[in-house]
Amino acid sequence: MHCAKSGDSLSTTIIHLLALAYGVPFVMVGIEHFRDPQKFVDIVPSYLPFPLFLVYLTGLMEIAGGLGIIYPETRIMAGRFMVLFLLAVYPANFYMWTNDVPFNGTRLTTNGHLVRLFVQFLLIVAALGFSGDLQKIRRN
């Protein structure tokens, strides 16, 4: 995905469209952290302090990461940031799974949690692609 520096305008356009498709949902979910924080507070693991603060912080990070992916000038750094961010927030998803915590009133089945884990993995791989690091890993 890092081929945006090449002169190929079609591949550059595709990269920009993929970046929009990846970044916009993160921005939207990040905004939702501020519009309805309680549904996110409910999934913060009980062992973490200051759940409302963490919800606002992760919302801000999702907005920043999503925007960073969208803009070519910040895409490499944002891709690396998103890898770390997605790894850092997965414990909330795991907490939901192991404690049967509903999100916004919905409890996921084991299969639902497995799908969510797989999607998290795909989001990390995509972030590695946007950063250019996936191509480096594949070359080695």
Model-found features: residue ranges?
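Membrane-interface extramembranous regions
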Residues: H2-N140
